[in-house]
């Protein structure tokens, strides 16, 4: 009986001690959007663990729970970001698990990351935020408790429970500007930096790029000198592989401009001044509303500009696509908006809203039959890439890839210090405009021919009495293809391109000639045309040049050509994948042919050997040809 009372007393005492210890520990609360005010609107400080439900029993959570139980008076909270992603995004928490300290409703910079978690580091992290204990004391394992086991605090009840320097990183500074660091979840779900403004993002990879660590300092300098209306950010592709694969980032560093979920890649030179100039252009680019009388001065001051004409019936969906076009046109050409019927008649816009590109005073109207085609963002961007350059421009290494985007390029060698320079430029511009009119007339003829075929088919169906066929053809739509250009007109300074000219052309003929020389390059085939069909050198004479261009486009093998001996006009040009694939297919066919020949030779030798074995067998009739008789 005494033994039973002894055991019963021990169990009761054990439960009393356990319950008293358990109730002395402040319970951890689960925080979400509906009860976030319980910690955000208090003056106390909290140790908040941001994690996911699948991480709740992993090493980080286990160590943090064990260490936090050693400090029963601290306030603990937990947020499951996979269950409440919006709340974590609002608090700018995108990487977890981690522990963040909340002081007076503000998040502190000193956090406990997943890669830092050990029992010692977690204990130091807690001690550095308690009482009079600072981080140095915590790292030296100095005890932060008084002799009676309570936290040592000389401050009053109204003072904060710990002393830390104020976090200044969030404050605005005109000298230092913070650089955003993005990850894929922040891009998809926490899109607050890209929803209302543009963002210029650098993609780097320290594993695949040897000099990318230099670019981090350069990018920080560009960030400080860029207009604050443009957000600046960077992405480390070693950690954010999913985001880099989403945007097909293969080279480093790569720069992209974002506006919402639209993006465009920067293809200019990777130089500090050019990147800084482009970033400021993107930051300040806006559509300018003009009046009818302003158009003349705009035509005289801009070789290329874009004009949007609208009326009272223009919808918000139409204006939204115009807003998205700013991303494509930033740093390329100005964008103007006007409500004028007179300008619509001047530029040949038959309906509103209309998008018009004006190059050297000549308009090109974006052809859209239905509202859906007008709001087709991909179709408009393809059209902008074609019409965003003037009819003639100088070929420079920095703009080389963007200018050589046609099938054929007409290049004229000019010397800026010669007397014929300006007259030759005007003649080349006249040829460019004439060729543009020729292309536009050809496209109109194609549309007219399509209409003739449609009406002829309707008449034929009516004649045969096919009512259903007549109805089907009548309501079929005649497609207006997107405007394309097959020829670009460029001029280059012969002194700057001297090495390329010597490598590919006759130096004496093409540099010392009084008449500006002209030649045509086909980039897809890597060939150059220096003469017409009759063997005469190409010049700026319209009939000869245009007839040569038409012959090359329709019958490319009928004109005299020579192969380009240099890799191409553009330095470090992109490889010609078409020729590369041709070479791969050719090598594969050669390999298959060789394999077939070897197979035939092996089969013939094997059959010959079998015939020889058959001839050596006994000639008796009861012996099989494959049986070898063994005799003693």
UniProtKB/Swiss-Prot annotation:
Reactions catalysed, as given in the entry: Catalyzes the rearrangement of -S-S- bonds in proteins
UniProt-annotated location(s): Endoplasmic reticulum membrane
Glycan-linked positions: 35, 41, 140, 557
Disulphide-bonded residues: 209-212
TM region positions: 583-603
Signal sequence region: 1-22
Pfam families per UniProt: Thioredoxin
Domain of life, per lineage: Eukaryota
Topological relation to the membrane, as annotated: Single-pass membrane protein
Broadest EC class assigned to this enzyme: isomerase
Listed GO biological process terms: ERAD pathway; polyamine metabolic process; response to endoplasmic reticulum stress
Function comment: Acts as a membrane-bound chaperone in endoplasmic reticulum quality control. Probably facilitates presentation of substrate to membrane-bound components of the degradation machinery.
Family as reported in the entry's similarity comment: Belongs to the protein disulfide isomerase family.
Name of the protein in question: Thioredoxin domain-containing protein C959.05c
Species assigned in the record: Schizosaccharomyces pombe (strain 972 / ATCC 24843)
